[in-house]
Amino acid sequence: MSENRLGICSTCQKNASKYRCPRCDSRFCCLECNLEHKRLTKCSGERDPATFVPKSKLVNHLNSDFNFLSGVERLINRKENGSHQVSNRAERNRLQLKRSLERAGINIKFAPPSNKKRRLNRTHYDKKSHLIKWSIEWCLHESSTSKDLTDEASENTIITHSHPESEPLEKIFRKLVEENSEMNSQVSKANIHAPDDMQFMIKSRKSRSKGFIYKKIEPSNSLSSCLRNSFVFEVPTIHVFTSTTQVHTESSYETSSSEQSDDSSSSSSCISDSEESSSDDELNELSNEKKANSPTQNVDTSSKLSSVKFQNEDDEDRRKNSDGSEASYSLPPLFGSYFQKQGQY
């Protein structure tokens, strides 16, 4: 009966078909024929929910619609739960990495998942060597002094991976130039010829007057010691300049700021001395005026007090009647006569 209803397999044309493709309604006898059909026709094998269904066959497709909606709900739940679990596992590893780096004196902040550095970052802890292997972003600045140092120089930026934290920075860079063709092309593009004439920097902070202030690192030190007491956003960014390029470093910035503070303190001391002298002169003038005007002021104040005293006594006499009772206050005409008759006022 099934053979008459489904017919012969559409792929092998030999056996009776047992299955039907939900997408294109083709018949198959086994899984191999189904896979061969998908390979030849590029069929996905999934039902198209937007396919037109006649009204006469609408009742028969209710189960398919229900299964489709249930499948969508399961897919959403699986995506939410699966991504949550993966993010928990990934976040747990990243949190452990962050704690170990903070113990080593490296302040790291991870980027959001949509960030490009986050997708390219492969920094991890290697269990075999018991070392952290870094992904490093190299920013190679051109040797021309006309270029603004505040630019990111994105055309000469490359990210490399799997650099042990115990390896010296100079050795890492030399190995990359020799073995990595992309790094070699970026170095030649930046007009950096001799590796010995280079200086390695990390951004420290930004000044309003001088732009970015860089922290100079020693290339002979290990990578972990170079990154100690520095801020890392997802991956460490190491800026490479030639020795002739003038860069605002922390030492030069502190020297200039100390000179400015000395100048400002000297000017402020001069101003304060002049203010003190002027204030002393004013105090002397005020004291002389007080001494000159003190007798007359005492006479005036005593006369004023006596006049106020006599005025208060006159007011009290006016408030009392001849029989010693206090004077009645003026009340509104409607209620005043009544209360006065009662003797309350």
From Swiss-Prot:
The modification Phosphothreonine is found at residue 296. It holds the Pfam family zf-HIT. Zn(2+) 1 binds at residues 9, 12, 29, 33. Keywords: Metal-binding, Nucleus, Phosphoprotein, Zinc, Zinc-finger. One of its GO terms (biological process) is sno(s)RNA metabolic process. One of its GO terms (molecular function) is zinc ion binding. The keyword Nucleus applies. Residues 273-284 have a biased composition (Acidic residues). Residues 293-310 have a biased composition (Polar residues). It is found in: Nucleus. Residues 250-272 have a biased composition (Low complexity). The modification Phosphoserine is found at residue 294. GO terms for cellular component: cytoplasm; nucleus; pre-snoRNP complex. Residues 245-345 are annotated as: Disordered. CDD domains: zf-HIT_BCD1. A zinc finger (HIT-type) spans 9-43. Zn(2+) 2 binds at residues 21, 24, 37, 43. The keyword Metal-binding applies. Disulfide bonds: none annotated. Required for box C/D snoRNAs accumulation involved in snoRNA processing, snoRNA transport to the nucleolus and ribosome biogenesis. Belongs to the BCD1 family. This is Putative box C/D snoRNA protein SPCC613.07. It comes from Schizosaccharomyces pombe (strain 972 / ATCC 24843).
